[in-house]
Amino acid sequence: MTQRDPSALTPEEIQKEALPGESWEAAARRIARKRAEAGKSGTPPKPQNPTSAKAAPIIRLPFWPESQRGAPNEIVRSALFNARNRKQKRGYLANVDVYVIGDGSITYTGEELRQDDETVWLHLIHLARNTPPGELVEFGPHAFCKAVGWDASGKSYQRLRDCITRLQATALGVYSKRLKEGLSLSMIPFFRWKNAEGHALKTYQVRIAPEMVEFFGEVHYTQFEWEQRLALPSGLASWLHGYFASHREPFPVKLETIREGAGLTMERLDHLREKVAAALEALRTVGFLVSWRVEKDLVYVVRA
């Protein structure tokens, strides 16, 4: 049997042994060096803090594969990023209660957020997952637009800046039984895309709120397939993708609950029924659902 190289590190090992404020790369080098030295001396490496290994605080966002994205459960079960058409006029919300399906409550101040804003936010969180909370995350607009399924054009760059600016000018309050106390934060506290002369930079910079780590927690977040989301129409289908992904075995849900959770404004149930059916069929087409049905205004789905 081939033995694993003791200096080869998994992301989970790096996260467990990293020191507060230590960059991902620095932690990997330090841990690998310590293991290599221990291997030469024949002495097994000691944990950084053996007395508190289980109680060590989470200092980074969770790690997930490149093919996936992650979001706190309360976000994907709420109307924070609603499913309305992104081209419709957006309202400004001042300390408004956001509808949440299940436990928890959210208050929000800022310009109305849609599913395209969530797509951008999800990829920003993805890029930040290897970076200590509060440190700058850098990326090029060309690569970012490609990663979220947009064409790399000046129009897309402007759309990207608009989305991040909306996320920056926010005040989000989250209250849940699992949190020791409520969280209040800006979703993107810092965003730089132009220099002092007003010219666009080749590399954009953002900073994710450190409190976001606590919001994710150890297990209270949803991972879902990124390519599936990008293949879906942006709107109700992408919202339902996140919502149903947050349940291993989704239970039946009322049409009215979907309407409120997705932040839709249509009142006629027949119109809502048609819209939900089209979105569910899109989820089946991309391979997320095996089957679905709407019976007596209850939605039943079976995940793949």
Located regions from the model:
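Charged, alpha-helix-forming regions
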Residues: 1-304
